Amino acid sequence: MTENKKIGIVGGGQLAMMMTEASRELGISVTVIDPTPGCPASLVGARQIVADYNDLTAIHELSEKTDVVTIDFEHVNTTALQQVVETGKSVHPKPQTIAMIQDKLTQCEFLEFNGLPVADFKRLDTVEEAHKALTDFDGKMLLKMRHQSYDGKGNAVVSNDNLEDAWNNFGNVKLYGEAFIPFVKELAVILARDTEGTIVIYPTVETIHINNICHKVFLPGDLNDTVREKAETIAMKTAEHLEGAGVFAIEMFLTKDDEILINEIAPRVHNSGHPTIEGSVTSQFEQHLRAVTGMILGSTDMKHNAAVMINILGKRNGSAEPKGVEKALEIEGVSVHMYGKHEVKIGRKMGHLTAVADTLEEASSHAEQAFELIEI
């Protein structure tokens, strides 16, 4: 029985905000942990525990007030979440899955062990090992932080010319090396698994990144059937090896030879799934809540032929003053989601917009028109 279920979310940012919005029609109440008073989720009705995300006492308080604990980002205290599991409460996805994904090297090892396609990689404990890896990777590779890397932060493309400097710039953090992949497209597959193991999958999307941050998402991606089927098969096989319920995002690279390699896994609702709010019968946010509470999963069919999303990022530092939203909403098929963040920072995700239409070209055009009208 899911009536009056209480969900706890570690993190109160925009992802928790959109989960809270989706919770209303499901009869679910939401409580979040977030260190910033008036966090985005609290602005749309979530109760908030003001505390650090990793605060052990706060996490236990959250579990006591709710039936199920989940996350809106993966850099959380998995030891505390495992303690919650040991009290008999449900945590989704499973803490061990979150912990595996937190370490990018163990994530690569997990993928390789399970026969899933991933770029060649090497553990690096010394700069000497990095030099050897660089030789093995034909003189060019990605040097990556194992922990706390996101939106391109914690990655560096290195060659013999800059390896030493890059290694030193990272400082005293754990690193690994990954073969440089000259991809032609970036893809993502959003899927959800319920507590019984049933998996549903959304159409593969294409993502466009600028400065390593997602700029635009096309639902569905402009892909041939072979590539689409291959991506969705890989995503399903990946999900079968993950533990716990909820939405997962599998990010991938497509090469010029139509080879697909997994870039990384996100154990949560994801930026690439935002077009599902307007574009799909069941949004990724509603789907996640259904999955973790034991409800029947919703349809992943599309409501429109095409949906295109664009992120609205900060271009300055200071107080947030959104302008042009009303004008943007006058464009056919456009919806705008502002996250209610008080402070704008360069590169910070302040909102997103989505345009739906009969074709990807039309949706993209309308989205770009709306995007040009909005200032933060």
Question: Where would I find each of the regions flagged by the language model?
Answer:
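Short acidic-glycine loop/turn motifs at beta-strand connectors
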Residues: 193-198, 255-258, 357-359
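Peripheral (often C-terminal) accessory segments that flank ATP-dependent C-N-forming ligase machineries
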Residues: 3, 290-376
